């Protein structure tokens, strides 16, 4: 049986009594975290559905926001392809020359290949005034066939002087409009009383095939379209699918294990991770001791446990002991782990987590110089013991390099300092899942300047981001704030510079102050958080900076949060615990490692700890 569409005119977009004090629909108990004040003012979101089974993808539905912002009534656009928005005025036949043809071609290619498109394009209202349309087109499949395309459109004013728009007489516009409307089938002349094909689908199909494919921000906007979609977007299971598709299965699994996650619900989790409204610093103390005292060790998180290995002791003595801090305990304290066959002592090395409870250490500076060996430790083994991995064709020995893990099985190492003192620019990969692991240098047509003290961060499925470090510039070395990315899913991966397109940073800066030995972590959705490290001048090392490399035009922004941050934070002493807590060890003096004091950055309300 066909479902009568509940049209926007019956939906109260003002929210009425259901609008919470913070301006979000429903507050903590509601389901649509969408700021009412921005609709349709500063950030109006249009919603368009086209029929992929008909030639030229004709529009079959637009929401009220689309009508208000563009000036086109629904009955004027139903049955047309949405490319008319690229023409200045309702009667112009050609695309305006200022519309980026490259973006148009990319969008056409995505539609033809049935893949998702994201981009920003110059569009025009009915009166000819320009506006920027940041849109996302998502193909909807049923039994492996694309049936519809869903478009979520974020409109903003375009500050472009195009001169007077082509005008028509006041009598001409209604006459042509009536002529166009009369050519439509009677059932399509008034969408508010007609039937929309998408609403003939069952709730299950809409939720699983359509809503679950959107981002948290998009689904929040979709919930404002009509009553039926409003009710569907209140379902916590729908939001879980949205978060899983956006953030990945592993991130979703980690969030599910956070204490209180079930109580708080996916709606609020999605909102807090998107807006960072609940992000806050907290200082806490732990028991136990790490003796002998040391610096330049490496820390890594395994679930709720923080592991430190090695470090530089008195008189530059390399250390090779292992300590664990269990933050899941009611009274966390540092404990020494008795392990057999420990690696040679070292500092300036990296310690990373691979599958489950396994840790991998690489390189560093030891008693007899630089190292390039690899050791694995299973923290949950009984008893735990280190095991050397004799990887074939290893990279040259190094220290102060950067590393990360991919897919839980692959170790990636980049840069660092060689025995000669020269800085390195190579990138190597070691697959630890192989029976006989072998190092492989990733061949690239171009490499960023050689550096040490930088960070490698994994985001998306198989992408890595490099930031900062002490980089070589001619015969000199300078702190860097450059950003480079590499997609390892490509047949021929290559480093690509990320250029900042403006920002909200003070003083008109396009990037955070240059630094090395800083902290860089990947947040759900692929955003990168940067802070800490060695920063020159009067710039604060504790200021948080956020970058989304997935954006078409990435731009840095400052993240201001509650609570008192640490004065210092170093990359080798900071780690993400449980996916929702960023723990900084020490951080008050920058020299003495007071490991009984720590700071944590809580990324969501439910992560508040009792320690």
Swiss-Prot record:
Changing residue 472 to R: No effect on the recruitment of ADO3 to the cytoplasm. NCBIfam families: sensory_box. This is Adagio protein 2. PANTHER family: ADAGIO PROTEIN 2 (PTHR46175:SF12), BACTERIOOPSIN TRANSCRIPTIONAL ACTIVATOR (PTHR46175). Component of an E3 ubiquitin ligase complex that plays a central role in blue light-dependent circadian cycles. Acts as a blue light photoreceptor, due to the presence of FMN, that mediates light-regulated protein degradation of critical clock components by targeting them to the proteasome complex. The SCF(ADO2) E3 ubiquitin ligase complex is involved in the regulation of circadian clock-dependent processes including the transition to flowering time, hypocotyl elongation, cotyledons and leaf movement rhythms. APRR1/TOC1 and APRR5 seem to be substrates of the SCF(ADO2) complex. Disruption phenotype: Accumulation of ADO3 protein during the morning period but no effect on flowering time. It is found in: Nucleus; Cytoplasm. It comes from Arabidopsis thaliana (Mouse-ear cress). Residues 35-114 form the PAS domain. 'Adagio' means slowly in Italian. Self-associates. Interacts (via Kelch repeats) with AD03, CDF1, CDF2 and CDF3. Interacts with GI, ADO1, SKP1A/ASK1, SKP1B/ASK2, SKP1C/ASK3, SKP1D/ASK4, SKP1E/ASK5, SKP1K/ASK11, SKP1N/ASK14, SKP1TA/ASK20A, SKP1TB/ASK20B, APRR1, APRR5, DI19 and COL1. Weakly expressed in seedlings, root tips, stems, leaves, flowers, young siliques, sepals and seeds. Residues 196-242 form the F-box domain.
């Amino acid at each position: 049986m066909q479902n009568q569409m509940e049209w926007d005119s019956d939906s109260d977009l003002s929210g009425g009594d259901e609008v919470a004090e913070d301006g979000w629909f429903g507050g903590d108990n509601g389901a649509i975290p969408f700021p009412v004040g921005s609709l349709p003012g500063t950030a109006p979101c249009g919603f368009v559905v086209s029929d992929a089974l008909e030639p030229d993808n004709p529009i079959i539905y637009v929401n009220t926001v689309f009508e208000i912002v563009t000036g086109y009534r629904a009955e004027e656009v139903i049955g047309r392809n949405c490319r008319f928005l690229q023409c200045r005025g309702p009667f112009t036949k050609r695309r305006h020359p200022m519309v980026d043809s490259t973006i148009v071609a990319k969008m056409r290619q995505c539609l033809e290949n049935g893949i998702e498109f994201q981009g920003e394009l110059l569009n025009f209202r009915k009166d000819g005034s320009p506006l920027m349309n940041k849109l996302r087109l998502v193909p909807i499949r049923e039994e492996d066939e694309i049936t519809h395309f869903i478009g979520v459109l974020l409109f903003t004013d375009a500050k472009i002087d195009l001169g007077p728009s082509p005008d028509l007489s006041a009598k001409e516009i209604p006459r042509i409009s009536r002529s166009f409307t009369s050519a439509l089938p009677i059932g399509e002349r008034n969408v508010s009383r007609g039937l929309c094909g998408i609403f003939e689908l069952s709730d299950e199909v809409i939720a699983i095939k359509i809503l679950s494919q959107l981002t948290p921000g998009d689904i929040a906007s979709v919930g404002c379209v009509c009553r039926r979609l409003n009710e569907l977007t209140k379902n916590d299971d729908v939001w879980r699918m949205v978060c899983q598709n956006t953030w990945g299965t592993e991130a979703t699994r980690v969030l599910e294990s956070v204490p209180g996650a079930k109580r708080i619900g996916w709606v609020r989790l999605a909102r807090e991770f998107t807006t960072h409204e609940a992000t806050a610093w907290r200082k806490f103390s732990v028991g136990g001791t790490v003796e002998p005292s040391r610096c330049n060790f490496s820390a890594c998180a395994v679930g709720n446990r923080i592991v430190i290995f090695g470090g530089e002791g008195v008189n530059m003595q390399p250390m090779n002991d292992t300590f664990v801090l269990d933050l899941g305990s009611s009274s966390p304290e540092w404990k020494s782990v008795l392990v057999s066959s420990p690696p040679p002592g070292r500092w300036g090395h990296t310690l990373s987590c691979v599958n489950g409870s396994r840790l991998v250490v690489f390189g560093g500076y030891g008693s007899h110089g630089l190292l390039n060996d690899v050791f694995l430790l299973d923290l949950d083994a009984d008893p735990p013991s280190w095991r050397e991995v004799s990887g074939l064709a290893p990279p040259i020995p190094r220290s102060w390099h950067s590393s990360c893990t991919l897919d839980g099985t692959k170790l990636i190492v980049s840069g660092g300092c060689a025995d000669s003192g020269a800085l390195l620019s190579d990138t190597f990969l070691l697959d630890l899942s192989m029976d006989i692991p072998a190092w492989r240098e990733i061949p690239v047509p171009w490499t960023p300047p050689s550096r040490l003290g930088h960070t490698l961060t994994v985001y998306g499925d198989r992408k890595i981001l490099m930031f900062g470090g002490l980089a070589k510039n001619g015969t000199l070395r300078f702190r860097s704030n450059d950003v480079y990315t590499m997609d390892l899913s490509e047949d021929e991966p290559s480093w690509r510079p990320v250029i900042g397109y403006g920002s909200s940073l003070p003083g008109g800066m396009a990037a955070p102050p240059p630094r090395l030995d800083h902290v860089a972590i990947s947040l759900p959705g692929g955003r990168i958080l940067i802070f800490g490290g060695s920063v020159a001048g009067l710039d604060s090392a504790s200021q948080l900076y956020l970058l989304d490399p997935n954006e078409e035009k990435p731009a840095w922004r400052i993240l201001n949060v509650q609570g008192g941050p640490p004065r210092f934070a170093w990359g080798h002493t900071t780690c993400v615990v449980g996916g929702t807590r960023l723990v900084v060890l020490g951080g008050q003096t920058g020299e003495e490692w007071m490991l009984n004091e720590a700071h944590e950055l809580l990324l969501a309300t439910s992560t508040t700890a009792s320690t």
